[in-house]
Every structure is written in C-alpha cells, then in structure tokens.
Amino acid sequence: MRKIIVGSRKSKLALTQTNWFIDQLKALGLPYEFEVKEIVTKGDVILDVTLSKVGGKGLFVKEIEHALLTKEIDMAVHSMKDMPAVLPDGLTIGCTPKRVDPRDAFISKNGESFKDLAEGAILGTSSLRRSAQLLAARPDLQVKWIRGNIDTRLRKLKDEDYDAIILATAGLQRMGWDGEVITEHLDETLCVPAVGQGALAIECREDDTDLLQLLAHINDAVTERTVAAERVFLHKLEGGCQVPIAGYATLKENDAIELTALVGSMDGSVLLKEIVVGIDPKQVGLEAADRLIKQGAKELILAANKEQQ
C-alpha cells in the first residue's frame, strides 16, 4: 500500500481543506494511506506588510513546491487563488475539485450592509483587487490593510477600529462559519472575484502517473475549464497580488465559457472590464487580456507596480 505524503500550510483553513480532500480520496476505497506534512511559507511568516509589497503570487506556495520537487511530499492542497500563473518545471495541477462559492464576503461590525456603511467608514482588506473595486463603488470609504488568518481578522474587526472587513466566502464556508459571521455576499458585478477564488489546486509532480490517475477521480471538469480560462488571462497580463486584477468564469449553456475580466487602478478611479464568451478556455483568457490591453491595462499594471516600489 502506497503512503502519500500531503503538504499543507499550517493554518486552520489550510489543514481543513487538506483533510477534506484526503477524505475524498479515502472514500474511493483504493489502496493508499495518507500523511499530512505541515510546511511554513513566506506568506505565513511576514504578517506586518501587505501582500502586494512582499512579492505577490507564490508567497504561500514556494516552500511547498520546493518540498514537492525534492520529494519530501507527493502532493499539496492549495487555494487556487494563491497559485502563480506559471508552475515550476516538473510540477502540474493534477486535479481541481468542484469549486465552492467564489464571492467575497462582507462582514460589518454592527451589521450594516456595504451600501449602508457610514460615510468615511474603515474597511479592512489585504487585497488590492477588493480595495480598488469597493473604492470605485464607495470612494468615501477608507481602506486599512489587514493581515492574518481568518480568526485573526475577525478578532481585529471586533477589537480594532475597522467598521467592516472582506474575506473569501469559500474559506468561511470550509470552516463552517459562513452562516454566523457573513453580513452579505458581494455580488460578482460589484466585486469580481480573484482568479481561482473558491477553487482548490492539487499540485503534484508531472511524472507521478500513479498519483495523477488517483487524482483524476476527484477532478471537476467544469471547474478545470473555467479556472483555466481565468489563469490564462492572469498569465497574459502577468498579474499577481501587486495589481488590482480579477477574473471569474462560469459555464453557460452549450458549453460556452463566460469570463468577466477586470484590471483597475490602485485607488479604484479607473476600472477596465471585459466580458468574453467562447468555447476554448485558452482563447477566452487570451481574448479577455487582449481586449483589456487595448483599453490600457498594461499602463495600469505598470503604474500599480511603480506605486509599490
């Protein structure tokens, strides 16, 4: 019986996601056993700086990918939105389980909705994507950066001077907390989700054919196709956490993919948005990027990167 070593970050959410996925594999009843190896990433250690200032995408995966390449672990369970657009040579996303709710969750201290927040209220987020879109809708709000895991951010909302914070609905759902803490879900038209938000990425070595065959049992074809379109878009624009960039795809009738893609200025004064429909994920992602580039997306990305140096 093969033992599969599964790499995971140490946070409660990461371990919850990892153990959930292992349970899906165990339910297949195949001759494998599993062991979780906890790994600390750079993003877990640097908590006093915004994500955009410490290197963006890859902050929560690089150390885990190193463990995969050196064969300390056999596979890893990541949040798809933490994954860089390009993986290291030798690694692949072996499986994308069915995506859960991709929306952002708005949580206010006193139960007000986003539109009813007082003028000048303080909104906590560590995401340029969220801050740009929400400032576009409510330029009067003050954005204050907030870092830490879900528990830490909820505690900061209660104890510090934040009036509201934004978290991913998916994480709260996986922890079983969505019913008790979320004030409202932000509609995708108000706040386009991050590329891959709500989805998991199961990463492994591309030459591990035995494991790839096992992972194929849990793969969700719709999630795989829609997330692929989002990630092609992200790659073409070379976007990471340093840029207000969003991409969310759904599957429509007749198997068409509809991708809503967005790039914004840091302060939300400019939001460029395109909706592209097509069958091939790669073509949809590339077309969305090309259309936004024609609108001036590259200039916004350069300006955002410069602003943070």
Swiss-Prot record:
One of its GO terms (cellular component) is cytoplasm. Pathway: Porphyrin-containing compound metabolism; protoporphyrin-IX biosynthesis; coproporphyrinogen-III from 5-aminolevulinate: step 2/4. Its cofactor is dipyrromethane. Its EC number is 2.5.1.61. One of its GO terms (molecular function) is hydroxymethylbilane synthase activity. The modification S-(dipyrrolylmethanemethyl)cysteine is found at residue 241. It catalyses: 4 porphobilinogen + H2O = hydroxymethylbilane + 4 NH4(+). One of its GO terms (biological process) is protoporphyrinogen IX biosynthetic process. It is an enzyme of class 2 (transferase). It comes from the Bacteria. Keywords: Porphyrin biosynthesis, Transferase. Belongs to the HMBS family. Tetrapolymerization of the monopyrrole PBG into the hydroxymethylbilane pre-uroporphyrinogen in several discrete steps. NCBIfam families: hemC. This is Porphobilinogen deaminase. It comes from Bacillus mycoides (strain KBAB4) (Bacillus weihenstephanensis). The gene is hemC.
